């Protein structure tokens, strides 16, 4: 048994000793069968939340009403959830109620896809009542039971299906895809925040190029912020190297570019992204437009962008063109290292010094003068030393006076 499961085995065994069933469930079991890195390990049990809390000395009640208790075991927190069935769903988002049951199969039946409805006991024996292993072998995303019913219960499952295409490289089962097409309008019931969470995982997946066109093919894009008229653009997005992008702002910048979005800020705000991501994605796009090719970087542009953003610009450009970005990154690192200053804060003079030198009241001219100074320093026209900057500034003033 793999270490993540071994570390949590004590919880399973303790529940078993008290006469309850307990199993590893969900994504961790799926990823074990796929040979993927195993994330959070979740446990399902026949024990009721109160019974779980009575057995373990260190627990946190994070949602016992819905069956979930966090058990802290050997310094690690694990979600332990009572077997349950879901009542009717309200607004195609969440069940109005849950009913605790003593049957593992009943619990697995309520899950979204067969690959996520697999359990494993303390001995490593797989319990798979809905054909999840077969779906994994065939690399198919298939719902547990009737696809229409699953998507009507929780419309976000349709986005999850396409997100799993991006993460796993699986295909949608025919009936699953048909049901998404039929139920796509239900996505309008889902909050933007939940859709954005799925979209970010989709964009970060190694198979994003396969998943993005599916948003158009299934009609989901009609109900996603800013994508209603972007079906053909989403299909073209399959040509780009999405896995090359490591940062979320790079992915959103590429999406804006791929979709032909003219104004990135309103588009990204519609997704309710953090301002920091919106600002940085916009800055990447603006710099990409200002520097039309890797060889076009000036010292001033590199200084203003900073190394991190400059590298982001080139990786987005590479994702668009398919050309390797490493040579550009190496060259930008070399050039940035050679800049005499890396930030405006490193300039040997500030506004107060400039005002003292010129002897004029403060005003917009101070910023204009400081901008001229850092540009001269960055371009090698003057060394970043107070005395040399003073001499350069006096000479500049004399030249300007002559030209007036």
Curated annotation (Swiss-Prot):
The keyword Metal-binding applies. InterPro entries: Bact_CCA-adding_enz_type3_sf, CCA-adding_enz_C, CCA-adding_enz_firmicutes, NT_sf, PolA_pol_head_dom, PolyA_RNA-bd. It catalyses: a tRNA precursor + 2 CTP + ATP = a tRNA with a 3' CCA end + 3 diphosphate; a tRNA with a 3' CCA end + 2 CTP + ATP = a tRNA with a 3' CCACCA end + 3 diphosphate. CTP binds at residues 27, 30, 111, 154, 157, 160, 163. CDD domains: NT_ClassII-CCAase. Mg(2+) binds at residues 40, 42. Homodimer. This is CCA-adding enzyme. It comes from Geobacillus thermodenitrificans (strain NG80-2).
